[in-house]
Design a protein with these regions (language model features):
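Conserved small-residue
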Residues: 21, 58, 76, 114, ...
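Stable alpha-helical structural segments in soluble proteins, enriched in small hydrophobic residues
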Residues: 99-107, 138, 167, 171
């Protein structure tokens, strides 16, 4: 196809869904301070905040877009997908690292080419540390890293699409949003985390990571 509309939407705020994730101890317990509850990578994080939303993108073949004079925001240069089936809830760094590596190879990039990573980072104690290790191993310590769920919460099935849009807008505007509520990074998270406010950056290549329960790992590589 010359044009594809792709995205995700989720309306998950229902007692059954909330009860299920609460039973798995995946949700934050900061009910008395909801504005401080979503805090990816922070040493005081205790789970994610469930939310709802939607995000959509229009993907076009490059030659088709040029022929019709479309304004191209960015290029989806590569994608990597793995399914490690390591555990229902616990992430596996190997599967995440392979997904990042596959996206880089598909895009014809190396870790050194990546300026920015929009991390999946939900704010769970184990998940954030695992992802930080995967990013370090597959990309390195140099990219500026943010975690949009600190502001949006976890949109579940819509999070990947929404964060892909965030990543593209970062490339377009040269402005990386900060990780909200990040006061002190947890031990084991040795990344260049954007905090305190937006950071100006002329990023040319960025990754958007999505690492779901059950070992479903997807990484998108965008360039501009």
């Amino acid at each position: 196809a010359d044009v594809v509309v792709a995205g995700g939407t989720d309306a998950c705020l229902h007692p059954l869904a909330l009860g299920a994730f609460a039973r798995m101890r995946a949700l934050s317990l900061r009910n008395d301070a909801p504005d401080l509850a979503s805090r990816p990578f922070d040493q005081e994080r205790d789970g994610f905040v469930m939310s709802e939303g939607a995000g959509m993108v229009v993907l076009e073949r490059a030659d088709f877009a040029r022929a019709r004079g479309a304004h191209v925001h960015a290029t989806l240069s590569g994608a990597g997908v793995t399914s490690d089936a390591y555990d229902v809830t616990l992430p596996a760094v190997e599967g995440q690292t392979r997904a990042i590596g596959a996206a880089l190879r598909d895009a014809g990039l190396t870790g050194a080419d990546i300026d920015h990573v929009n991390a999946h980072a939900t704010g769970t104690p184990v998940g954030d540390v695992t992802e930080a290790r995967a990013v370090r191993e597959a990309v390195g310590l140099h990219p500026a890293v943010t975690a949009c769920k600190s502001a949006t919460g976890h949109l579940l099935g819509a999070s990947g699409a929404v964060e892909a849009v965030f990543t593209v807008l970062t490339l377009v505007h040269g402005l990386i949003p900060p990780v909200r509520n990040l006061e002190k990074a947890s031990d084991g998270i040795e990344l260049d985390l954007v905090s305190g406010g937006p950071r100006r950056a002329s990023a040319r290549a960025a990754l958007s990571t999505s690492f779901g329960f059950g070992g479903h790992n997807v990484v998108l590589a965008f360039t501009r």
